[in-house]
Regions:
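An N-terminal hydrophobic leader/cap segment in hydrolases
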Residues: 1-55
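The alpha/beta-hydrolase serine catalytic core
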Residues: 12, 159-222, 249, 280-286
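Conserved alpha/beta-hydrolase
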Residues: 84, 91-113
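Alpha/beta-hydrolase active-site loop
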Residues: 116-137
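Gly/Ala-rich beta-loop-alpha elbow adjacent to hydrolase catalytic centers
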Residues: 140-149
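Short beta-strand/loop motif that positions the catalytic acidic residue
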Residues: 219-221, 226-228, 232
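Short alpha-helix in the alpha/beta-hydrolase fold that links the catalytic acid
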Residues: 236-244
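Catalytic histidine-centered segment of alpha/beta-hydrolase-like enzymes
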Residues: 259-269
Length: 286
């Protein structure tokens, strides 16, 4: 039995007599987020072009990145166990079109050390980036970064257009993958939920609804383009279908095949759709 399986077995056993302790131990493992992903070799040239600065947010010195001359900023929000350089192929396209991409390494990711942050930390970071760079011509979010992007726009961040790639719709998805990896049983998952509620949200049990991208998504007033692969093994395609239904007529969903969770970032057709939409073209119907 490997370490992950042993850890899950131990947490499941502990959750019966001591759910609070099991939940707290699981939370501490969850918040680590895994090892920092290095910049991929094929992305190093784009990464090296960025102006790198830091933002002091909570306990973190957050690494931020900006490309271009500052005109027409486009915010890029990466996903779980990722980093800003994930967007390198899109950054190249946007620079060629005269846009100025802006991004950051989330807490516990990339060059930003420490533990992982929450949706509230992401909102603060995005707000500071808007203060520095101005209204965004577009916001592009991938995976968990898509959920963070929707929440930020609901909370008053200004942007003209929104692109959501392999999007997380339900906030509970932030722990679902972790729980599945450790094979946590329902009692241990419930203990983890409670520990997260207490540690980050003052015991508020409504966060799983309030911070879901589907919550009040109908209040979004900007055009939205969603792209999601039907074979995504990490975030089911159904998550984007749910988000599409919640947003309503301002949104369109493009379903790809064979790209899985990360292939959209380098797929030429997907990049064409994204950049055309950012430039003001109507969202494609399929």
């Amino acid at each position: 039995m490997n370490t992950i399986a042993l850890t899950g077995t131990a947490l499941n056993a502990l959750a019966l007599p001591a759910p609070a302790l099991a939940g707290e131990l699981a939370r501490r493992l969850w918040v680590r987020g895994g090892p920092a992903r290095p910049v991929a070799d094929q992305d190093r040239d784009v990464h090296a072009l960025a102006r790198v600065e830091t933002l002091h947010v909570g306990e973190w010195e957050v690494a931020t990145y900006a490309w271009g001359d500052g005109a027409r900023p486009v915010l890029l929000a990466h996903g779980w166990r990722s980093r800003a350089s994930w967007f390198a192929p899109l950054v190249r396209r946007l620079l060629d079109l005269g846009y100025s991409p802006v991004s950051w390494d989330a807490p516990g990711h990339g060059a930003t050390g420490g533990r992982s942050g929450t949706v509230l930390d992401a909102l603060e970071i995005i707000g500071l980036l808007q203060s520095r760079h101005g209204r965004f011509n577009a916001v592009v979010g991938h995976s968990l970064g898509a959920l963070f992007s929707v929440h930020a726009l609901r909370e008053g961040i200004d942007a003209d257009r929104l692109v959501l790639l392999s999007s997380v719709a339900d906030f509970e998805t932030v722990i679902a993958g972790f729980a599945a990896e450790l094979r946590l049983r329902p009692r241990a998952v419930a203990a983890l939920r409670t520990a997260i509620e207490r540690r980050y949200f003052g015991g508020d049990t409504t966060v799983w609804t309030r911070f879901s991208a589907t919550h009040d998504a109908h209040t979004l007033t900007l055009p939205v383009l969603l792209l999601h692969d039907r074979e995504d093994p990490m975030i089911p395609h159904a998550q984007s279908r749910r988000l599409l239904a919640a947003i309503g007529e301002r949104a369109r969903l493009v379903t790809t095949s064979g790209l899985r969770h990360n292939g959209i970032r380098t797929d030429a057709d997907s990049l064409d759709r994204i950049t055309a939409f950012v430039q003001g073209a109507p969202a494609p119907l399929s």
